[in-house]
């Protein structure tokens, strides 16, 4: 049969998962398409080392020659970083790429899908895709949203880029049943900026609270993602005045040039990079670094919870078996002296035979 599609998990990642050790998934689109060469390769290695330094196994995900791989070795990571022919693969592209033997970098959506398929519960990325500006006319919405609605994975991100429609994105996340929590923040971050004008319903204070939320979601049988919105520290974010000026100019230029639909977002990103003198690129890298650190902490908390005998998500061995009968309860098969036996004769009723004899002539 032509094509290959079985997911191959590296030995390191496979052993970590089997042992219940912490694992964090990493996307490869940032490496292949989000950063300039050769810095992209250095950042890819740095992010993996950042996870390892915290005691977590990194699992960078990509498709190599038609085979989805969870955990890349050094040659594969170098290939994703250096080869200009590496394509960008979202969920819809995976079956074709696998069938035809292509090599591609995975987006947030396809990374989340492949990670969840092999049992990875944590995923760190820079920012989520979302609803694009003007989506009311173009229907341009990232596949990240609908994919996360069906994947039981926790994604740590710095929100969504301010070039997107943040309000509409939050509405879609709510509609799709995706839990969103702010990590030590009550406002949704805007990727380049630590805060936006959009308030969040839920705030968590540490990695343990996120792990507890994951356990509660499992108990409820939920199969959608949890999005952990982790804002950049103020000193690592883009200058707010510069951000607002560049965004206003970029939107105006897009309108003047008749740029619409799917062409808007790449134009805005390119404009941000040019007009900020590359500062937006540094923000992007800082965001991913911070998110890998937080995702690693959550993965550690999740692994500890999974192994703990007091894990609220695990059954209590000292609790009574709900399937076993209660020894203090009355035997439902025994007659109840306080209730009439509907199947037996009523002793207070007259004997029909005696009544018949009394009326015999």
Curated annotation (Swiss-Prot):
One of its GO terms (molecular function) is pseudouridylate synthase activity. It is an enzyme of class 4 (lyase). Residues 312-333 have a biased composition (Pro residues). The active site is at 27 (proton donor), 161 (nucleophile). Its cofactor is Mn(2+). Keywords: Glycosidase, Hydrolase, Lyase, Manganese, Metal-binding. Residues 306-361 are annotated as: Disordered. Belongs to the pseudouridine-5'-phosphate glycosidase family. Homotrimer. This is Pseudouridine-5'-phosphate glycosidase. It comes from Frankia alni (strain DSM 45986 / CECT 9034 / ACN14a). The gene is psuG.
